[in-house]
Amino acid sequence: MPEKMQVLGSRKGLTPAVQNYTMVNVSDNSGAKEAMIISVFGYRGALRRVPYANVGDLVMVSVRKGAPDVRKQKFKAVVIRQRMPFRRPDGTWISFDDNAVVIVNPDGTAKGTEIRGPVAREAAERWPKVASLATLIV
């Protein structure tokens, strides 16, 4: 990503996966274990419609469980896994065992130094600095 974090404009045809108030696992070693999504960046929907995010989207999370220095704080994060099946352009359907995010800094780099578990290819393509820490890209 360039200096400023960018979000996609069109969301047509995407499967609503994680939305506001969804509890997600934090898959890096930043100290957070579990977080709640509180907003989705770049979402332009109808009035009173709950915003949703997909793999690779930038969200704001509130850390609920983890180390005392990160609990009760808000961070930007990238969705790297979702349980809801989604379709890739080649026609394959993919889903993961959990909903997971990686906490990122304002410049788009991950706050932690390692990512546990697989990372979706869609997230790795949009966030190359996050992909460099991934052990497995699916």
From Swiss-Prot:
It comes from the Archaea. Pfam families: Ribosomal_L14. GO terms for cellular component: cytosolic large ribosomal subunit. InterPro entries: Ribosomal_uL14, Ribosomal_uL14_arc, Ribosomal_uL14_CS, Ribosomal_uL14_sf. GO terms for molecular function: large ribosomal subunit rRNA binding; structural constituent of ribosome. Binds to 23S rRNA. Forms part of two intersubunit bridges in the 70S ribosome. NCBIfam families: PRK08571.1, uL14_arch. Belongs to the universal ribosomal protein uL14 family. This is Large ribosomal subunit protein uL14.
